[in-house]
Amino acid sequence: MKRVTENQGKKTPGVDGEIWNTPHKKATAVHQLRQRGYQAQPLRRVYIRKSNGKQRPLGITTMKDRAMQALYLLALDPIAEVKADPNSYGFRKERATADAIEQCFTVLCRDYAAQWILEGDILSCFDRISHNWLLANVPMDKAILQKWLQAGFMEKSVLYPTAEGAPQGGICSPVLANLTLDGLETKLREKYPKATFALPKSQS
């Protein structure tokens, strides 16, 4: 409750137009979250401009869905940290881009350091994650996860289904993306055994 009512998005409603901005609304929401029969609602699709001039789609969840995701995130976060690649720095607690830069400095200042750096982006990473893979590998209530993944999104009063991807803007989406990418560093080390890695974050 505190996370979704005190962050920057607390005044941004989802498709239902609701925000929890009074003690009464918060108390009612707590009661509703304890009830059975939870159903995720579609996301409200908006677009934000990227630095390159292109627009990135962002999914705005309802306050109730945000609260449910925040609840499950309490359990998912520790698992994701245990499974995380050692040089993964994006979307992780107590880690930031500055840590990735420090890792780069550490390995490049050696006498035997590599003479080049390879930088790459995973195109549309969040949008292309397999729902089947998430349902098979993410350790949480599968029914709840499926409801989030298949909630769809509303754009100009039209409901669009979601067959793949983790919605950008969802509280759990960064952790789902990290769980999906775990093991990438190991695969790269196997293919390029002499390389040293620093993985800031995936790009959309």
Predicted regions and their residues:
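N-terminal core-binding DNA-recognition domain of tyrosine site-specific recombinases/integrases
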Residues: 56-59, 115
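Active/ligand-binding-proximal structured segments within catalytic/core domains
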Residues: 68-76, 176-177
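Extended, charge-enriched "interface" segments that sit outside catalytic cores
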Residues: 42, 46
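Charged boundary/loop elements
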Residues: 2-9, 74-90
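Non-catalytic, polymerase-adjacent accessory regions of viral genome-replication enzymes
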Residues: 1-27
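Conserved polymerase palm-domain catalytic core
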Residues: 32, 36, 86-87, 92, ...
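Residues immediately flanking
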Residues: 15, 74, 120-122
